[in-house]
A protein has these predicted regions:
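Exposed loop/turn and edge beta-strand positions of beta-sandwich/beta-sheet ligand-binding modules
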Residues: 20, 53, 88
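Short hydrophobic clusters on alpha-helical segments that form packing/core surfaces
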Residues: 43-47, 55, 66
Length: 101
């Protein structure tokens, strides 16, 4: 039995009617088991309950796995930050429009 073990975490902040995901990660041992999907679905529902219009994030263009994950939740690429990361890779700016009540 594992106690007090973090499987995944999402750090985000709200500005006006938008939320920005700053950090979203699932422990490698627990990937492909639905935890990331659960966490993202939970975040989206919470943001919609807060009547937020958009959910935003940045992801490295070279992180194909993360890009595929975000596309499953209908995040679209709305911009690019060239040479954003230390290795020179670009950051893709992603946005998901939310359903407000």
């Amino acid at each position: 039995m594992i106690t007090n073990f973090v499987i995944g975490i999402c750090v985000f902040h709200v500005v006006l009617d938008e939320a920005q995901i700053n950090y979203f990660v699932v422990n490698k041992k627990f990937r492909k088991k639905g935890f990331g999907t659960y966490l993202m679905s939970y975040l989206i529902k919470k943001c919609e309950k807060l009547n937020l219009r958009k959910l935003l994030l940045e992801v490295s263009q070279s992180n194909v796995t993360a890009e595929r994950f975000y596309s499953r939740f209908d995040f679209s690429t709305v911009g690019i930050r060239k040479n954003y990361y230390k290795d020179g890779s670009h950051a893709l700016l992603k946005e998901k429009k939310l359903t407000t009540k």
